[in-house]
Amino acid sequence: MSLPIEQYPELLAQKVDNLTALLAPFNPPPFDIFASETSHFRMRAEFRVWHQKNEQGENDLYHIMFDPTTKQRYRVDQLPIANQLINTMMQKLLTQIQGIPVLTHKLFQVDYLTTLSGEIAISLLYHKKLTDEWLAQAKLLKQRLSEPGLTVHIIGRASKQKIAIDCDYVKEKLNVAGKTLIYRQVENSFTQPNAKMNINMLEWAQKCTANSQDSDLLELYCGNGNFSIALAGNFRKVLATEICKSSVHSAQYNIAQNGIDNLQIIRMSAEEFTQAINGVRQFNRLQGIDLSAYQCNTIFVDPPRAGLDQATLNMVQNYPRILYISCNPATLADNLRQLTTTHRIERVALFDQFPYTHHIESGVWLIRK
């Protein structure tokens, strides 16, 4: 499997053209363009596992993926878009579990999650119950895969069962504008897949929101606190919402690890928060939190591909400054049709989070007219 690296500048230019065309009706300023590394940029990968008898009658294992068009499976020995640690561990893992039936029997998927700081979580997914024998062999596997300067975590998952050898997360360290930020990233939870592009996104967001220490920030869909932790130093206080329980726990850990004392996470959806802030409903989860104490002049949104729902869009429009990170330029453009009736676009960025795909990640900074 090879990458069309020589075509990367042209492919990126096509994305710029596509985003330019979508946003043209809103008269945006020139874009800030952030190109990706051309290989080994992806920090996580998922593979199905294929079992095949060799000539000796032994069970060989391969990583496989599926062609998105034909749906045909194909063998993957190396994945150039994945970082070097994943590629190294792909070969090492299969070698180390070969011939150990309790580790290979009914193994159907392997997930890898890595960090720039030299950690990897390997999740082994099974169509069987995990036993004490599996646990004993998984502990030995962790020892064999570990080496100086490399932290390896092994997680086993089966129906209604999850066993982590030591822990089920990696600890990432990102150098953002000269400051090291620490993030716990839990396996099987969302994290930004392109770590170096994530740094670009965080630094761009910091520049947009600079000199805001006299007001507060509201963030919807905060995940593990990726943006809110990086932006906390720019504001007096930060209030952030997240619905996923494991992400909230990670965010609380990350807040403590980074010594952030002005960031409050509440577990509720954007739709629920809209109801709360408008006084439509009261929530027990907000006991002890005085929403009126926050003077949020800036709102940060990073919605799913569907974009902002109508109620949230109406609520977002009430804030003087809007920072919008989008993973779908079509729904971004749709949302901007309403937002630009009251706000002007101050800055736009294209972050090439997913090279060699049609996917466009972008950021828009809006100021009330």
UniProtKB/Swiss-Prot annotation:
MF terms (GO), sorted A to Z: rRNA binding; tRNA (uracil(54)-C5)-methyltransferase activity, S-adenosyl methionine-dependent; tRNA binding
State the active site.
Answer: C327 (nucleophile), E361 (proton acceptor)
Under which EC number(s) is this enzyme classified? 2.1.1.-, 2.1.1.35
Question: What NCBIfam families does UniProt report for this protein, alphabetically?
Answer: trmA_only
Which gene does this sequence derive from? trmA
Q: Which GO terms describe its biological process?
A: tRNA methylation
Q: What is this enzyme's catalytic activity, as reactions? A: uridine(54) in tRNA + S-adenosyl-L-methionine = 5-methyluridine(54) in tRNA + S-adenosyl-L-homocysteine + H(+); uridine(341) in tmRNA + S-adenosyl-L-methionine = 5-methyluridine(341) in tmRNA + S-adenosyl-L-homocysteine + H(+)
Residues that coordinate or bind S-adenosyl-L-methionine: Q192, Y221, N226, E242, D302
Q: Which InterPro entries match?
A: MeTrfase_TrmA_AS, MeTrfase_TrmA_CS, SAM-dependent_MTases_sf, TrmA_MeTrfase, U5_MeTrfase_fam
Which GO cellular component terms, listed alphabetically, does the Swiss-Prot or TrEMBL entry include?
cytosol
PROSITE patterns, sorted: SAM_MT_RNA_M5U, TRMA_1, TRMA_2
**Does the record bear Ribonucleoprotein in its keywords?**
no
Job description of the protein: Dual-specificity methyltransferase that catalyzes the formation of 5-methyluridine at position 54 (m5U54) in all tRNAs, and that of position 341 (m5U341) in tmRNA (transfer-mRNA).
Q: Which UniProt keywords apply?
A: Methyltransferase, S-adenosyl-L-methionine, Transferase, tRNA processing
The family classification in the record reads: Belongs to the class I-like SAM-binding methyltransferase superfamily. RNA M5U methyltransferase family. TrmA subfamily.
What lineage, starting at the top, does this entry show? Answer: Bacteria, Pseudomonadati, Pseudomonadota, Gammaproteobacteria, Pasteurellales
Keyword tRNA processing in the entry? The reply is: yes
Coiled-coil features, chain-numbered ranges: none
Q: What is this protein called?
A: tRNA/tmRNA (uracil-C(5))-methyltransferase
